[in-house]
């Protein structure tokens, strides 16, 4: 390629030189002096001047042959080589950029499974699922064992929060087992305080009993929440009581038993205007039964002070308790009155059927529930009570009859007669009339 380009250049250069030499020689031989001036002046031209060589210069003669256009050759061979390299690179790039034709995908032939193959596949899947279930059960069992071990490591009597967190089940706290001996010792240090105003709080109650000893804790009871969504504990903390509630009760726990015994001196003291408190040991339950009476048929809206005034003439009263509904705080219609001695109980029993707020009271001795259970379980302790319904057997014609228990009654007792059943006639029933048959004539 490079050699052909050089030969073309040489030929073209020689042709140009020849054409330039011919033109110069022709111009020098044909030109005459004065031809240009005469043409400008417009004067008479010499004869034969029209056909001179000068006029031929301005004539438009048709070319003998059409011009030939020859492409210009490149100057250097290095540029040509570079261009060739570029062309090769472009061709390679174009070849790489051509989209690759996707080969047609081969159709996969699906084999039809036979019934035996299907059964085998089902068995394998069932076995695999059974293995997974066994692994899950094993993991759950290991988790339970770890939890039980961690619970076992917790020592008895450790923090209460840990015990409560372990006892949680489904968002509900289970009851923690209580040591009865510890509870008995705690009750000996506990004082019951009744008829407290709803405005009383823990700080006031502690300051009221601080002169007798150090107070360990205070718990409010008989609380009626103002809203149904509040619990009793939360209502006592937030001081949100029902507007109809006027008094509450509390338990005060001292650190020493001697302090609890000294605190009984506050019994009958006035903590607020119209509120005389009742103070008694929480452990004295056996002696209470002998010194207390049961009062029934009470008005539902009665207050402790009204019941206390009704029994003041019988003797000095230690405590009055009206049983109320734990949710609504309304009285259930019965209560208990505790006196200082048993002599006041005999006088209180005489107030049976007495009226209070338009109701006749029912006054009886307070009996321990455990004793009632023992009497019901032992038939020997029961009194002979005649049952209201007894079947009578009429055995003799003399008028004597006795019951199943074998007790005979007097002759004058009314025995009665056995009634004869009579069939009742239906209404509208007509008597049947017998038609006489006509005699046959002979």
Swiss-Prot record:
Cited SMART domains: RRM
GO MF annotation: an example: RNA binding
Site of covalent link Glycyl lysine isopeptide (Lys-Gly) (interchain with G-Cter in SUMO2): 246
Keyword flag RNA-binding: yes
Keyword match RNA-binding: yes
Biased composition (Basic residues): 421-442
Positions of post-translational Phosphoserine modification: 292
Sites bearing N6-acetyllysine, chain numbering: 153
Composition skew (Basic and acidic residues), residue ranges: 112-122
One Pfam family in the UniProt entry: RRM_1
InterPro entries in alphabetical order: Nucleotide-bd_a/b_plait_sf, RBD_domain_sf, RBM34_RRM2, RRM_dom
Compartment(s) of residence: Nucleus, Nucleolus
Keywords, alphabetical: Acetylation, Isopeptide bond, Nucleus, Phosphoprotein, Repeat, RNA-binding, Ubl conjugation
Domain RRM: 189-284, 291-368
GO CC terms in record: chromosome; nucleolus; nucleoplasm
Sequence segments annotated as region (Disordered): 1-26, 60-157, 418-442
Similarity section: Belongs to the RRM RBM34 family.
Protein name: RNA-binding protein 34
Source organism (scientific name): Mus musculus (Mouse)
């Amino acid at each position: 390629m490079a050699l052909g380009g050089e030969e073309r250049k040489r030929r073209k250069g020689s042709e140009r030189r020849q054409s330039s030499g011919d033109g110069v020689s022709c111009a020098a031989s044909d030109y005459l002096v004065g031809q240009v001036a005469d043409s400008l002046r417009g004067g008479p031209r010499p004869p034969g001047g029209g056909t001179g060589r000068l006029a031929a210069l301005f004539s438009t003669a048709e070319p003998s042959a059409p011009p030939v256009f020859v492409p210009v050759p490149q100057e250097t061979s290095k540029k040509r080589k570079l261009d060739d390299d570029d062309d090769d690179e472009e061709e390679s790039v174009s070849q790489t950029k051509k989209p690759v034709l996707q080969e047609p995908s081969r159709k996969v032939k699906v084999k039809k499974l036979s019934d035996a193959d299907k059964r085998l596949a089902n068995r394998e899947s069932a076995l695999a699922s059974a293995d997974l279930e066994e692994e899950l059960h094993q993991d759950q069992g290991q988790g339970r064992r770890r939890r039980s071990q961690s619970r076992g490591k917790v020592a008895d009597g450790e923090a209460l929060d840990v015990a409560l967190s372990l006892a949680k089940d489904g968002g509900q706290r289970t009851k923690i087992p209580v040591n009865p001996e510890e509870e008995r010792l705690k009750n000996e240090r506990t004082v019951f305080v009744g008829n407290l105003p709803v405005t009383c709080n823990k700080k006031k109650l502690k300051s009221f009993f601080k002169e007798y000893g150090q107070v360990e804790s205070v718990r409010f009871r008989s609380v009626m929440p103002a809203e149904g969504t509040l619990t009793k504990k939360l209502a006592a903390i937030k001081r949100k009581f029902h507007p109809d509630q006027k008094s509450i009760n509390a338990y005060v726990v001292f650190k020493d038993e001697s302090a609890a015994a000294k605190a009984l001196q506050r019994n009958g003291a006035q903590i607020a205007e119209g509120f005389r408190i009742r103070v008694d040991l929480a452990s004295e339950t056996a002696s209470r039964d002998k010194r207390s009476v049961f009062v029934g048929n009470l008005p539902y809206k009665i207050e402790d002070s009204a019941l206390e005034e009704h029994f003041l003439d019988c003797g000095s009263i230690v405590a009055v308790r009206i049983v109320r509904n734990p949710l609504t705080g309304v009285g259930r219609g019965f209560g208990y009155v505790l006196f200082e001695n048993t002599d006041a109980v005999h006088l209180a029993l005489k107030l049976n059927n007495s009226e209070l707020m338009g109701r006749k009271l029912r006054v009886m001795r307070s009996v321990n529930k455990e004793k009632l259970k023992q009497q019901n379980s032992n038939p020997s302790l029961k009194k002979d009570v005649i049952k209201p319904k007894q079947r009578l057997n009429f055995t003799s014609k003399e008028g004597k009859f006795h019951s199943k228990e074998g007790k005979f009654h007097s002759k004058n007792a009314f025995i009665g007669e056995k009634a004869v059943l009579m069939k009742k006639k239906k209404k509208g029933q007509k008597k049947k009339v017998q038609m006489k048959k006509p005699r046959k004539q002979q």
